[in-house]
């Protein structure tokens, strides 16, 4: 295995995922559409807040609050794309990304299969979100009693109701898409982190696989062997430091975003569950909610899974270090080995606070939060 200068990634194995989650929003027309949708739904949300708090009776409040709660997630998604849209667009320029064939054919096939699976998942879930958005283009009689916007158009702008409703419905094409975009961005970042960690792990695992003498005890006094180990250790340490720097830098960038998105995700889940509990379910609404729930649950599950795999891969690097025959290293090499082991034992996570990271535990906490809030609200009805 080569421990010299590596070829850098030219062709992104997750380019489809990057395009639908970032690149497409770099065009001027995309930004104009985002501003337009933000203006429309931001205005409706502000007016809806006034009506929910001061105008609607209890029954109306329970009818309208599910769709109201569900609007905060896409609004946050739009704001982030407009003001923090460079999150993953230049990741290849922020750290040297090795080609996925840098650690042998077996690892190459493994990473390629993982990237193919993630690409297929992204495309299928993207299509589900688009179809889900299209369903909102079809008017349902219950819309006027479910969405604040249609209630306002019907009661305050009857002459322009058809025109205003059509414009508002068109925005759902983008909203369905926006529900998955930022999950895709974190998945893209996490997956590339996992691939690069896998490549590093293979280099660590083969670090002491030099041609050995028959008597292994003599390796400690073999200057040529120790020199080769030294070069490989330094190579792996430098790579791990760059990787840690990238994770820490990205964690600083997304610290606040993940927390706020988690809160909005809870509100979205509460809105969906409240609508299911309302009993106002027709065939059309069931289909809408089914696609929304499937698409959202799928991308959130993939998000937590990707974050968890970054942690798991970090632990595998530690295991690979422990498996080395470090007792054959000389004093200087042992010091370098201990430095790398100490750094590696600090598990790398995609996190937004000291206590919470993007992993399975966060997913469980969100589900528990949704359940607790729903229980309180049901008891209040």
Regions found by a protein language model. Name each.
Residues 74-95, 183-200, 300-324:
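Inner-leaflet juxtamembrane helices
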Residues 2-35, 119-125, 210-381:
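Terminal membrane-anchoring module of integral membrane proteins
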Residues 94-98, 203-206, 323, 327, ...:
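A short linear boundary/processing microfeature
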Residues 2-65, 97-190, 195, 202-222, ...:
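Helix-loop-helix junctions within predominantly alpha-helical proteins
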Residues 44, 70, 90-93, 172, ...:
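Generic structural signal for well-ordered, non-membrane alpha-helices
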Residues 60-81:
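Transmembrane alpha-helix/interfacial motif
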Residues 86, 132, 165-168, 195, ...:
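Active-site-proximal helix/loop capping residues that flank conserved catalytic or ligand/cofactor
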